[in-house]
C-alpha cells in the first residue's frame, strides 16, 4: 500500500512538472498593460491654435525621448521637448526617457495632419 502511495505521488508530481514551462518554472508570470493603457495620449487644441499633447505614462513604464516622432509639421519646425531623465539602455545605449507624464506643446496653428510616433517599454522588459 505504501509503495502504491509513493508511486501515485510521483506520477502526480511528474504531471505537474510536465505542465510547467521550462522558462517560467519557479517564476511569477508578469502581466503587461496594453499599449493604450501603458501610454495614454490626450490631445488638446487651444483656441489660439497649435496643440498640447499629454502622455500619461503608467507606473513601471517609460517613453524614449529619441523615439518620439512628429510628422506633418512645417519644414524646420520641431517641438521643444523636456530634457527627460538619463537612462542607459542595453540596446540603445545612453538615452533619455520620460516617466509618469510628458507634455509637448506644438505652437504651429495648423496641426490637423500631425502624425505621431513613439516607443516605450516596461521596466519588466517588454517594449512597445
Per-segment meaning from a language model:
Residues 2, 17-128:
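Structural recognition of alpha-helix starts/caps
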Residues 5-16:
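Bacterial N-terminal signal peptides
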Amino acid at each position: 500500500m505504501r509503495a502504491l502511495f509513493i508511486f501515485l505521488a510521483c506520477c502526480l508530481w511528474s504531471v505537474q512538472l510536465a505542465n510547467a514551462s521550462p522558462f517560467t518554472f519557479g517564476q511569477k508570470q508578469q502581466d503587461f498593460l496594453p499599449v493604450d493603457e501603458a501610454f495614454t495620449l490626450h490631445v488638446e487644441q487651444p483656441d489660439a491654435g497649435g496643440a498640447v499633447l499629454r502622455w500619461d505614462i503608467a507606473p513601471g513604464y517609460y517613453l524614449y525621448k529619441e523615439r518620439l516622432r512628429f510628422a506633418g509639421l512645417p519644414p524646420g519646425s520641431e517641438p521643444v521637448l523636456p530634457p527627460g531623465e538619463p537612462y542607459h539602455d542595453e540596446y540603445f545605449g545612453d538615452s533619455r526617457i520620460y516617466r509618469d507624464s510628458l507634455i509637448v506643446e506644438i505652437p504651429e496653428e495648423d496641426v490637423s495632419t500631425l502624425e505621431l510616433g513613439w516607443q516605450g517599454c516596461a521596466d519588466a522588459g517588454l517594449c512597445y
